[in-house]
Amino acid sequence: NMIAVKNHLDELESEAIYIIREVASQFERPVMLFSGGKDSICMAHLARKAFWPGRLPFPLMHIDTQHNFPATIQYRDWFVKEELGANLIVRSVQDSIDSGRVTEETGPLASRNSLQTTTLLDAVKEFNFDCAMGGARRDEEKARAKERFFSFRDSFGQWDPKNQRPELWNIF
């Protein structure tokens, strides 16, 4: 039934907006991860709705693998500047490779995706962020299905689900 689907989506949207507002109020230096892809565009749209008509109270940050289509980067820059009026921080995996912080993979299945973690952790430290918001669909990967709204990480960016605190969002 379309009404039930719409009501469910409205509930999910309201919950997401509530959590984004909570992050902005409870953390001193939050950042929203933003690549220009569909997940991050959805997150940015929810953030815009959360603070409309004001501006976002936190910057957006892209950890760039430099393996994106040029049109994606152009759209990223346009969307952040023109649609959101937000501050965009870009840090490059290539810079991490050039500085010797990470080693680029080789071979036919080489990817820079796993190298993003070091660049992200370096940027979090550089800007002293105390919360990084990102969007991921739980149905894409089993590990993501275990994640909660807040996934507390250690200094290496690792998440241990056994140490995860309970989240009782709808018990109040």
How would you describe each model-predicted region?
Residues 1-172:
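Nucleotide-activated chemistry modules centered on ATP-dependent adenylation/adenylyltransferase
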